[in-house]
Amino acid sequence: MVKELIRVKKRVKKQILDGIAHIHASFNNTIISISDKKGNVLGWATSGGSGFRGSRKSTPFAAQVAVERCADIVKSYGIKNLEVMVKGPGPGRESSIRTLNTIGFRIINITDVTPIPHNGCRSPKKRRV
């Protein structure tokens, strides 16, 4: 019985210069995903997945660590320039943008894409504590 050798080609990562960083900063968590201009996600990270649990997950430092993890994943693609899309009112909003800048990405523009209702659904009732 003769065994055939199967050759697997190494997948070469494309070199992409420009990308889009989507930052979803909620009150409980911060989700960062970096994609190319077409919207294909290259890498993502969350503050919960970075080892933070409970109330520490919603801190600016947790968002900073998540951005650093996401940047390590995406650096292999050769991205230099980023457009930043920020969604949500969370505490990791500003620190994640600053971290992207200090890592070495050139930020082209920052856009706030937080959804704002034009008197849509009724908001939940106020908490009584």
UniProtKB/Swiss-Prot annotation:
One of its GO terms (molecular function) is rRNA binding. InterPro entries: Ribosomal_uS11, Ribosomal_uS11_bac-type, Ribosomal_uS11_CS, Ribosomal_uS11_sf. Keywords: Ribonucleoprotein, Ribosomal protein, RNA-binding, rRNA-binding. One of its GO terms (biological process) is translation. Disulfide bonds: none annotated. GO terms for cellular component: ribonucleoprotein complex; ribosome. Gene3D superfamilies: Ribosomal protein S11. It comes from the Bacteria. Part of the 30S ribosomal subunit. Interacts with proteins S7 and S18. Binds to IF-3. Belongs to the universal ribosomal protein uS11 family. PANTHER family: 40S RIBOSOMAL PROTEIN S14/30S RIBOSOMAL PROTEIN S11 (PTHR11759). Located on the platform of the 30S subunit, it bridges several disparate RNA helices of the 16S rRNA. Forms part of the Shine-Dalgarno cleft in the 70S ribosome. This is Small ribosomal subunit protein uS11. It comes from Buchnera aphidicola subsp. Baizongia pistaciae (strain Bp).
